[in-house]
Amino acid sequence: EEFVTAYTPYQAEISQGLLQSIFEYQTMICELTGMDVSNASVYDGATAAAEAAAMCRDRKRGTICVSASVDPKTISVIRTYCFGSGAPLVILPEKDGLTDMESWNAMDTSSIACLIVQTPNYHGLIEDGASIANAVHNSGAKLIASCNPIALGLLETPGEFGADVAVGEGQPLG
């Protein structure tokens, strides 16, 4: 028998087994992503990306930027979140299937809170996380990396290349 849920239990004293499972999942995700902390209480990868973008916003930097090489379904969810909150959304173009960082460097990034990239991206290509992180951080924004947890066994982790937030879909794990 298997129990799967996107919900966090409200009564910790009667949910120790579920809490133990969530703790072990979060520990594994931290190891895979190279990040210090993990959350397990969002519905899916697209929602996680939208929540991460909302987390990065502040009064001076409220614009969300998403690479065009991110899964269109994820972009759609982020667009919905931005519409509901009134956050401006910018889609950064792609070039040869990868995030076009020349476009990033040419734009005014003073109001951009974060850039969301996906690696491997929607086209199956691996983004250059370190150079993207460098450019994004030099502009004062945060980098959100959306990644496939299975691919993280082979690829440089978001923590290694300097992402501020890592998000992903749990479905590839089974």
Please tell me what each predicted stretch does:
Residues E1-A48:
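Conserved N-terminal alpha-helix of the aminotransferase class I/II PLP-enzyme fold
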Residues T47-A50, A54-G174:
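Conserved PLP-enzyme active-site core in the AAT-like
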